[in-house]
Amino acid sequence: MDVLSPGQGNNTTSPPAPFETGGNTTGISDVTVSYQVITSLLLGTLIFCAVLGNACVVAAIALERSLQNVANYLIGSLAVTDLMVSVLVLPMAALYQVLNKWTLGQVTCDLFIALDVLCCTSSILHLCAIALDRYWAITDPIDYVNKRTPRRAAALISLTWLIGFLISIPPMLGWRTPEDRSDPDACTISKDHGYTIYSTFGAFYIPLLLMLVLYGRIFRAARFRIRKTVKKVEKTGADTRHGASPAPQPKKSVNGESGSRNWRLGVESKAGGALCANGAVRQGDDGAALEVIEVHRVGNSKEHLPLPSEAGPTPCAPASFERKNERNAEAKRKMALARERKTVKTLGIIMGTFILCWLPFFIVALVLPFCESSCHMPTLLGAIINWLGYSNSLLNPVIYAYFNKDFQNAFKKIIKCKFCRQ
């Protein structure tokens, strides 16, 4: 959003830079060629990478069937929105930045501001929609499977655009101050105090609060599940050390398949190990008592499960079996803790990037209209803040897609042109 225009917040005659206020009389001739070249290269690279990154995400979802699910539809819609920012908004913003003045006329300025606010607001609200979808998926996984439909995704996407439209249109209908159009060389968003509060809270502060709450609850739910798994693993290890093997869990088969199965149980004796018949336990060569049942699934496969013996305090499992279970329990505990660290890292990257890109911009956008006569915005700082917000459209596909292995595989296919051959 181009709330901070070249020249805003600075009425001095200091050397021109991207962010001096309206009323600034500097023209194209006052901007050095080196500034124009360097700025053009930097902003051109940012725009090119943003277009390429978001286009690849859209192409990956369109071409790879495994990526066509509700969660990725939201990511794809975010990529389309950021692609619109990159194609419709950033080129005009870059031209404005390089020339240090608006040269495209008032009508184009109004259209530019409306597109800017609409697309950037929709992009931010897409992040809320993704957070909401993830929150429902992790806190209500059973019921949400049936509710997580393309229709629901379409409703969330439509809502992001509706809110963006309601925030971007009012200035075109007159919710602005007369001073907003007083300088033909400047193109800024409405500085009306009421609209400033309405737009900044609707486009950023309320979505930010919502995302903090949602991701906070997602983290707590994920941590609860992970630590529950750790406790279960530790209990399993303790039971093994005290001579009790964990009973098979319902709805889980020996060979890892899920769902209900018909089982047939029979006792089998194995030479050199635990010798069992008709529920009686005999001592094996290693001195350990181990009852072994043979589990036959209706089909061809069979497995042998050690069960706790009822023949006194003799350990159920050989020492090697116990050590193996302890190693497995420790490995599972480490994996669970690693998942928790990964969850913290992922959520930190998502929220950290969003806040880093947009918070400085919206602080200035909220404060500046209320103290325009007394506030001074350094020109270079203003440019950095403005383009830091725009750069979120470049970083979104990296965070939400490129770290995903399924997307990585699809990108490799695109690069190798496998879809072309298909």
Curated annotation (Swiss-Prot):
Residue ranges that the UniProt entry lists as topological domain Cytoplasmic: 60-73, 133-152, 217-346, 404-422
This protein's record includes keyword Kinase: no
GO biological process per UniProt: adenylate cyclase-inhibiting serotonin receptor signaling pathway; behavioral fear response; chemical synaptic transmission; exploration behavior; G protein-coupled receptor signaling pathway; G protein-coupled receptor signaling pathway, coupled to cyclic nucleotide second messenger; gamma-aminobutyric acid signaling pathway; positive regulation of cell population proliferation
Membrane topology listed for this record: Multi-pass membrane protein
Chain segments annotated as transmembrane: 39-59, 74-98, 108-132, 153-174, 194-216, 347-370, 379-403
Pfam families hit by this protein: 7tm_1
Position of sequence motif DRY motif: 133-135
Intrachain disulfide bonds: 109-187
Residues the record lists as binding serotonin: 116, 120
Keywords: Behavior, Cell membrane, Cell projection, Disulfide bond, G-protein coupled receptor, Glycoprotein, Membrane, Receptor, Transducer, Transmembrane, Transmembrane helix
UniProt short sequence motif NPxxY motif, positions renumbered to this chain: 396-400
Protein location: Cell membrane; Cell projection, Dendrite
GO MF entries: G protein-coupled serotonin receptor activity; Gi/o-coupled serotonin receptor activity; neurotransmitter receptor activity; receptor-receptor interaction; serotonin binding; serotonin receptor activity
Segments for region (Disordered): 1-23, 235-262
Gene Ontology cellular component list: dendrite; plasma membrane; synapse
Effect of residue 405 to A: Reduced activation of G proteins
Family named by the database record: Belongs to the G-protein coupled receptor 1 family. 5-hydroxytryptamine receptor subfamily. HTR1A sub-subfamily.
Subunit organization: Heterodimer; heterodimerizes with GPER1. Interacts with YIF1B. Interacts with GPR39 and GALR1.
Function, as annotated: G-protein coupled receptor for 5-hydroxytryptamine (serotonin). Also functions as a receptor for various drugs and psychoactive substances. Ligand binding causes a conformation change that triggers signaling via guanine nucleotide-binding proteins (G proteins) and modulates the activity of downstream effectors, such as adenylate cyclase.
Disease as annotated in the protein's UniProt record: Periodic fever, menstrual cycle-dependent: A condition characterized by recurrent fevers up to 40 degrees Celsius associated with the luteal phase of the menstrual cycle. Women show menstrual cycle-dependent physiologic changes in relation to sex hormone levels. Because ovulation triggers a significant change in the hormonal milieu that is similar to local inflammation, a 0.5 to 1.0 degree Celsius increase in basal body temperature after ovulation is commonly associated with progesterone secretion and is believed to be triggered by the induction of several inflammatory cytokines.
Record protein name field: 5-hydroxytryptamine receptor 1A
Biological source species: Homo sapiens
